[in-house]
Structure formats: C-alpha cells, structure tokens
Amino acid sequence: GREYAGQVEVADIGFPVQALEAVKAAEGTAAGDFAVTYGDEDLKRIPRRPAYSNKGTFGKVLIVAGSRNMCGAAYLSALSAYRTGAGLVKLLTVEENRQILQERLPEAIIAAYTPDQLMEGREEFRKMIEAQMEWADVVVLGPGLGNGPYVEYLVEDILTSAFVPVIIDADGLNAIAGHPYLTSYYTENIIVTPHLGEMARLTGEGIEQIKENLAGTALEYAG
C-alpha cells in the first residue's frame, strides 16, 4: 500500500522521442498524412465556454447503448459525455436499464424501449427514432447493444435518420459487419471507431494484415 510506496512522482506522459521521429520520417506516406501532434498553441482552438449560458448551450448528445445484460456500457458512455462537456445527455436504452441508470446518473434523460416494441411496431418505432434524432446534436450508437435480432433494425433506423453526426462503435459496428447492406446508409455524417477486431469483421481482412497498413485500411474503408 501507500506505506511502502516511497516517494511518488507524477510525470508528464508525453510522447517518446522515438515516436515523434517516426512520425516525421513517415511524412508523405498514408501513415504520415494521418499522424498529427499537438502543442500548447492548439489548445487555443478549443472554444471557450461562455459564462452566460445554460445546459442547452453546450450541446445535446443522444446515446443509443446498453442491453439487458450490459447497462454499464450505456452508463459509462453517458458519464463520459458529461465529463467532456456535453450539456444534455439522453440515453436510448432497453427498459430493463431504466432504474439502475436513473439511480447512477440521475442527471441523464432516459428514453426506454423494449425489443418486442421494436420488432412488432416497426413504423411507430421508426417515428420515435426520428423524433429522438431531431432532438440531438450528435449521436453515439453501439456500446453494449448486444447481438439480438432487433439490433439490426435499430441500427438501420438510426442510420436512415442520420441528419447529425453519428459515432458508431462496438455492437453498432458488429451489426453492420453482420449485415453489410447497412453501409449503403453511410453519409458524411457517419464516424466509425473500430478496434482491430471490429475492423477485421467490417473489412474481411485479417488483424495482422490490417496492422501492416493501418492508415491505408482506414482510407480504403472510408471510400
């Protein structure tokens, strides 16, 4: 414990000199084109938060996340949105998650649905999704959605209503990998954030193959 830790120093994590040298050496290549380093001057690009403001001033985030056995993904996504400055956060999740999320994060807005509601009332559900999308300035889609049969339709309804930026992660990407026709709904508003395993499922390429050409694979997938 702390008694045996000795003197603790907090060091700047920084970037290894070797890493920065590798970035410089890669200039002119696909990897170099996407390698960016930031300095103190770049902090000035972050907009100042006005003092004369309210929670509606700082954006509305709709998070479509969580399933019966994975409410933590929804909770952590919403908490992260608040901690990075979002003014209003709404969670669209399954009904089973309502109570625990209201207890753990009472400041969040909860909009709940049931898988049966989605599967049996497609048109009504689609109208509900459209209304939620009109409310939002940005959407997060995927964390902890699971792989139930209804997830395909949920992802489709979000993508067809994507008039604001939509960040797709985790099970949202898995649904797209399992149902490739969903990529036909991609627009300039869609941002995907796959890890290596998810990228392998999306592209059909092996993980080792992707590792050898990370930037190139991303560029090719982006079209």
Task: Give the location of each predicted region.
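Small-residue (G/A/S/T)-rich helix-start motifs and N-terminal tracts that mark the onset
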Residues: R2-I167, N174-V192, L196-G223
